[in-house]
Structure formats: C-alpha cells, structure tokens
C-alpha cells in the first residue's frame, strides 16, 4: 500500500515543464483529484497555454505556406469585371429626325447597308476633294470602290504585258481602295519581268485593278472599269516599261516552254 501511495503522489506532483518535448507530454490522470487541483490538459499537447502557443505557430506556418504558394499577384484584390457592352442600336433606333427619309433614300440608291452608308459619309469628310468611284468587271462578279479625284491622271505603261492587255491605270493608296465582292472569283497572274500582280475575273477575264509587288500599299485601277457619272476628265501619260529585249527573251522562253509541254512530239523527233 505504501508503494501505491508513493506512485500516486509522484504522478500527482508531476507537471509539464516548458522544455519538455511534445512526445513526452502524456495525459496526466490523477486518481481522486478534483478539477480545481488538476489543470486542463490534452493528450500529446500538455497544458492549455502550451496548446494555444503550438496552435498559433501552426496557423502562422500554414498561412505563410499559402502565401509562398500563391505568389504576389494572387494576393492582390482582383479588379472588378467590366460590364459587357450592350447591344448596338439598330438603324431604326437612331434619332435621325427629319433626315431619316434622306438617309434611307441615299442608302437604297447606292445599295449600301447602314454601316456602308456611314462609311461613305465619313470617308467623304476625311477625303475632301475626292470622289467615291465604284466599278467592276464585265459580268459583275468583281466589284470595288475607290476614292480618287474626278480628274484622273492615267498611266499608259509601255511594257509588253501592259501593251498586250491594254491596261491603262491610275494609282491610288491601298487605304482608299475597297474590294466590295468577288475575292473568290479573282485569278492572279505575275510576270517574270513585270513587278505587279495582275488580277483577272475568272468568269469574264476582265482586269479591273492590279497591285504592285514592290509596294503593296498602292493599287492600279483601270479607269474604263469605273461606273459612269463620277469621272470628269482623263489625262493619259505614257511611261516607260522594262527592257524590251529582256521582255522579248522572257516571253519567247515562256512560249517555247508552254508549247513543248502541251504539244506532242513528232514521230521523226521520237525516232531521232
């Protein structure tokens, strides 16, 4: 009985010291002791104050781990998402007032949509002194529009290609040229001696315009393909083309190559 009492007394007097490791902090069960005499403890933690300190350190470590994992960008408050743009107002909703009838008449006469009519009016304001020309090929598959003066300065190139196809043209910046329709109907041909992309309609074969290879920002438009009513005068200026001898040699080589590929060989040539 003396040993049992001594062991109970030793267990009752035993307390956790701050330097004890967590593994050594076991539950302290005191037989016959009241709650006022025995402090509140937890298994594996020790006293209540030590448990609070340990829990605070654990929470701080967990928070810093999340901070390092998230990065600085994720910690910043996200900007509020902008409101989606509302639907664009239809032409009927525009407050045109007494000009609505003129607007509809202008749009129907030119066969333009509301956006196209607005573009024409804005271009007229941005290009003062220029005229809005429209044109196309013979069958109507290719249609284009161009802003140019009413008095056209037409270039007559003397190269063999331009002489054969009679391509007189006036030059305009690419920003003033708009292909309205027929992109799928255009066939492009490029000569070895002429730095230009000659575009033809695949149905009727008419060339309405061409683009320069050296400067794609410039278009050459055929004046005879423009619609009537917008051209006031035409001044033709002849310019020199490439070297006639070089062009003739290249043309002869192209003709010989094409004829040799398409024409069958003579029986005598096959025997030799």
Curated annotation (Swiss-Prot):
Keyword field contains Zinc: yes
Residue ranges with Basic residues bias: 1-17
Cofactor note as given: Binds 2 Zn(2+) ions per subunit.
Coiled coil regions in record: none
Binding of Zn(2+) 1, residues: 137, 139, 201, 204
Binding-site list for Zn(2+) 2: 157, 159, 162
Residue ranges with Pro residues bias: 79-90
UniProt keyword list: Metal-binding, Zinc
Names of required cofactors: Zn(2+)
Record domain CENP-V/GFA: where: 133-246
Stretches the record annotates as Disordered: 1-23, 65-95, 240-272
Zinc in keyword set: yes
A molecular function GO annotation: carbon-sulfur lyase activity
Family, similarity comment: Belongs to the Gfa family.
PANTHER family in the cross-refs: CENTROMERE PROTEIN V, CENTROMERE PROTEIN V-LIKE PROTEIN 3
Protein name from the UniProt record: Centromere protein V-like protein 1
This protein's encoding gene: CENPVL1
């Amino acid at each position: 009985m003396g040993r049992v009492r001594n062991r109970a007394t030793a267990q009752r007097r035993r307390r956790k010291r701050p330097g004890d490791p967590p593994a050594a902090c076991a539950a302290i069960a005191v037989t016959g002791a009241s709650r006022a005499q025995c402090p509140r403890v937890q298994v594996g933690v020790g006293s209540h104050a030590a448990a609070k300190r340990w829990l605070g350190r654990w929470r701080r470590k967990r928070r810093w781990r999340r901070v390092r994992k998230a990065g600085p960008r994720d910690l910043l408050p996200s900007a509020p998402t902008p409101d989606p743009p509302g639907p664009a107002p239809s032409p009927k909703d525009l407050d045109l007032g007494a000009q609505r009838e003129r607007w509809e008449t202008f749009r129907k006469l030119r066969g333009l949509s509301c956006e196209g009519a607005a573009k024409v009016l804005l271009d007229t304001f941005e290009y003062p002194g220029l005229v809005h020309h429209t044109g196309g090929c013979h069958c109507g598959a290719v249609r284009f529009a161009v802003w140019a003066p009413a008095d056209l300065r037409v270039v007559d190139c003397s190269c063999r290609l331009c002489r054969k196809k009679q391509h007189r043209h006036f030059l305009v910046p690419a920003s003033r040229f708009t292909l309205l329709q027929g992109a799928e109907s255009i066939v492009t041909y490029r000569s070895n001696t002429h730095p230009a992309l000659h575009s033809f309609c695949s149905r009727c074969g008419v060339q309405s315009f061409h683009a320069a290879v050296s400067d794609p920002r410039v278009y050459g438009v055929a004046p005879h393909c423009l619609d009537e009513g917008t051209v006031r005068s035409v001044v033709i200026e002849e310019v020199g083309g490439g070297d006639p001898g070089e062009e003739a040699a290249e043309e002869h080589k192209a003709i010989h190559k094409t004829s040799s590929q398409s024409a069958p060989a003579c029986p005598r040539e096959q025997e030799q």
